[in-house]
Structures are given as C-alpha cells and as structure tokens.
Amino acid sequence: MAAVVVAAAGGAGPAVLQVAGLYRGLCAVRSRALGLGLVSPAQLRVFPVRPGSGRPEGGADSSGVGAEAELQANPFYDRYRDKIQLLRRSDPAAFESRLEKRSEFRKQPVGHSRQGDFIKCVEQKTDALGKQSVNRGFTKDKTLSSIFNIEMVKEKTAEEIKQIWQQYFAAKDTVYAVIPAEKFDLIWNRAQSCPTFLCALPRREGYEFFVGQWTGTELHFTALINIQTRGEAAASQLILYHYPELKEEKGIVLMTAEMDSTFLNVAEAQCIANQVQLFYATDRKETYGLVETFNLRPNEFKYMSVIAELEQSGLGAELKCAQNQNKT
C-alpha cells in the first residue's frame, strides 16, 4: 500500500523524513523506542509546575485572585494576553465564570480530567469555527478548483497528480499531503463518531495542547487555553483542508493547510498535522483508544497519555530538539 506523503514547505526537510519513516513502519527519529511511561535521562521532558500548588486544607482559593494568578503563571499566557484582557473588559462575568471553571479543574488528580463540560464547549464552538476562521484571515470556502483545474488533472495518473501537488506547494510556507483513499476512509469513518481530539505540541516550556475539531472535511485546531478563556469566540489557528474529489477515480485525497502565523510556524503546524494520522489512521488499538475515550468517556481521559503516545512515536522529537538548541 502506498505510503502517505506528507510534507512541509519552507525548509522543513526533517519533517518530511520524519513522516516518511513513520508511515513505512519505521521510526527514524529515535534510535530506540521506549515503553509508554518510560523516559531515559537523555529524553527527559520539562513540564511547567503551577506555583503555589500546595493549597491549604479546605480546597480552592477564597477569591478569583488565586485563579487569575494561576492563569498568568501559565507559560503560554503571554501568547493570549490581549485576547484574555479583551474578554475581561468586554464581559467580566464570563471572564470570572471561566476562572471558576479552571479552579474546579485544578482540584482533579494530576493526569485526569472531568471534562464532560469541556467536550460540550468544544461541540458548541463548531458552529462558530467558519466565521472565526475568516476573521483571522483564513480563506472562506477554500475549494480544490481554487487551487488548480480539476478537469485538466483528471487526464493524469495519481502519481502525476501527486507530483503536481508537491511542486505547487514546494515553495510555499504551508503543510500539504497526498493521502491514499483507504487511509483517508479510515480517518473519515473514525471522525464521524469521534470528531474531536487533543494534540500535544512540543514547546520550550513543555507541551501546549491543541484541540482538533472536524467540520465537514475541514479539521480546525485551536489552542486549549484559547478555548478555556474564550469559549465559542476562540478562533481556529490551523485548518487542514481535505479534498476527496479525486478519491474514487484516482484513489487519492489531497490535503493542504492554512495557519495563523502569529501562533504557529510551519514545523509546528506539521507536527500537529502528523498527529492526525498518528491517532486516527493507526492500526494500534491503544492509540485510537485515546480518541474514543476523549469523545465517548471524557471523564476517563488522561492528558498525559497523549504526550506518552507522542513520545513513543517519535513525532515532534526533532522539533523539540530544535527548540532546545535555539534556547541555548
């Protein structure tokens, strides 16, 4: 079976090698795999620890001050400072309500999340995705015909179309892919019952979580902290567009993406896109089981399981390494 071809333009060569190795059953970015939950000294990851986490007996803070201080201590707070402050000024009640929800969330055991309400929040947000995406500069109704002449390429073979697709995007700062029809069918069928999932993006400070939500053949991603603080007003920061127009005749599905470059670069968007196939196109029951748990049994879901699976796969390892090198 043909391997999934995923590439990132803009000089992200290592990402191409990383994915090509992964979907041929190889893991070229890590010399040896470790079992889930095992980390060698050379592969230690730094996770941000909430200051003042040792609360006195009796539970949460007596006012919203502690919750707000905790929010500001989030290593990704600066990225969303303006949006959070705008919400605080325009709708103080909504701002306080979200702080209260965060206070309830931090009472839960580490690694667990009682997130039934959060799943509902993500589902409610779906209707607003299109509007918010356009407001952030994304293309409205991005069709395959807006990229190239469909009638013209129908005369070509699947391999020729793949080459045209790759050449077209080679000089563009974006993420793109040519997905075999059977692989896309597996992803698509699973997305119908499990349309939402969580991806972990390596950052210098640890990991940042992004929520993926299918809406038609588009897959929208938004940072988790963005949803927690802005709810339905949270805009998409990455959209993957899938085009099945040639699936039946040519046996391929074309994919490209748009991203908000103020939050993501190409390599980071690539890492998120890779995780779609890691979790939705896998033959490994335990891996897709995380997607099912997130959608069907959210109270049993463990955030750390996503990071463990990402570590096991090797995805994002080179991105993390590059970030650490830039830091030094």
Curated annotation (Swiss-Prot):
UniProt xrefs under InterPro entries: ATP11
Any one Gene Ontology molecular-function term assigned to this protein's record: protein-containing complex stabilizing activity
Annotated localization: Mitochondrion inner membrane
Presence of keyword RNA-binding: no
Superkingdom of the organism of origin: Eukaryota
Transit peptide: 1-57
Pfam short name (any one): ATP11
GO biological process: mitochondrial proton-transporting ATP synthase complex assembly
Tissue specificity statement from the Swiss-Prot or TrEMBL entry: Weakly expressed in muscle.
GO cellular component: mitochondrial inner membrane; mitochondrion
Membrane topology: Peripheral membrane protein
Keywords assigned: Membrane, Mitochondrion, Mitochondrion inner membrane, Transit peptide
Biological function: Has a complex stabilizing activity in the assembly of the mitochondrial F1-F0 complex.
Subunit organization: Interacts with ATP5F1B; involved in the assembly of the F1 component of the mitochondrial ATP synthase (ATPase).
The family this protein is said to belong to: Belongs to the ATP11 family.
Listed name of the protein: ATP synthase mitochondrial F1 complex assembly factor 1
Species of origin: Homo sapiens
Lineage of origin: Eukaryota, Metazoa, Chordata, Craniata, Vertebrata
